[in-house]
Amino acid sequence: MTLELSAAGPRTPRITTRGETVPTVPPASTAADAVDVTALLERGRTLATPVLRAAINRLAPPMDTVAAYHFGWIDAEGNPAEGDGGKAVRPALAVMSAEAAGAAPEVGVPGAVAVELVHNFSLLHDDLMDGDEQRRHRDTVWKVHGPAQAILVGDALFALANELLLELGTVEAGRATRRLTTATRALIDGQAQDISYEHRDRVSVEECLEMEGNKTGALLACACSIGAVLGGADDVTADTLEKYGYHLGLAFQAVDDLLGIWGDPVATGKQTWSDLRQRKKSLPVVAALAAGGPASDRLGELLAEDAKSSDFENFSEEEFAVRAALIEEAGGREWTAQEARRQHTIAIEALDTILMPDHVRAQFVELADFVVVRKR
């Protein structure tokens, strides 16, 4: 049986268990070889961090300390630390989008910080709902400070995000806030879908893509437009940048799904087979179940048996490895990798429909390339 996505044209990725040829996807663009993606990410982090720290300092104790721990600025005892603050993809995109509108990168900083606050609000709640005990190579907030603090600090970060934008007091800030709140609502919808899918035997590829578009694509789309909106861009430009960001988000999540099963824990900061431990209906799993064939059928049987178990505490590493191997044998790993490349291509093509400085376009291309080859 072959799994296909509709309306994707000649680049449609396929998986098969019957010996058919899997079409290749063009490699990630090399048009921006001169762009240093590490420098792009660091610029976004450098511009956003002072404003982010000042925002966190507004929080009442102990929420300020708990948030500082989450961002890696202090350790569990309150001592200064140099923790891993994440990849900083969203801040980088926000300041780049300001440049796309012809504004200085600094114009996008309030948007960069607002998006980063919403992103981390979602991580705090997500870790608690999923029972994740590790993030960025350290214990999660709920594990150290308790579930109540994780919930409260997450709520506070969401409030701060809107506060920072509205304090600008401009028409552009109002437009930016509307886009951010719309993206946040979509993110919450996606999280609700994700949780509900954990308790279903079957989820379609289309449902999975919709969920991941909401959960990851919406906020990345906002990051790609919010700086441009603050810089005075019209809705056509902002909407096009959002399209780039939405499909970049789907590519990003597809890679995350691969790392959630086959990623190196040293690089990801999470347990081996982390998504399998949480019964996630991620793209590799959904695609493998939809593929048909012996490996797909056996995987379905095992996952149905797993659903009857209250937890996976007694599962051996070998049992998780068996499930991962069946997903790969059924074609779920290969299909998801190709889907990441397909979404990457759609994102890049969106950039061709609007005007922006050539060096900024090259930055967007390079960052998209980074997303599909990253290891964490």
Could you tell me what each predicted segment is?
Residues 2-4, 65-114, 165-166, 205-248, ...:
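Alpha-helical phosphate/pyrophosphate-handling elements in metalloenzyme active cores
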Residues 66-70, 114, 131, 179-183, ...:
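Short acidic/histidine-centered micro-motifs embedded in hydrophobic/aromatic stretches
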Residues 33, 37, 41, 59, ...:
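Residue-level recognition of alpha-helical structural elements
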Residues 127, 163-164:
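Glycine-rich phosphate-binding loops that contact phosphosugars or nucleotide phosphates
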Residues 82-83, 135-157, 201-216, 239-243, ...:
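Divalent-cation-assisted or electrostatically stabilized phosphate/pyrophosphate-binding catalytic cores
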Residues 99-102, 227-236, 259-266, 300-308, ...:
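C-terminal helix-coil-helix/basic helical segment that borders enzyme active sites and/or dimer interfaces
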Residues 1-114, 118, 124, 128-143, ...:
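Conserved N-terminal diphosphate/IPP-binding helix and adjacent helical/loop segment
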Residues 53, 59, 81-87, 151-152, ...:
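All-alpha helical catalytic cores of prenyl diphosphate-utilizing isoprenoid enzymes
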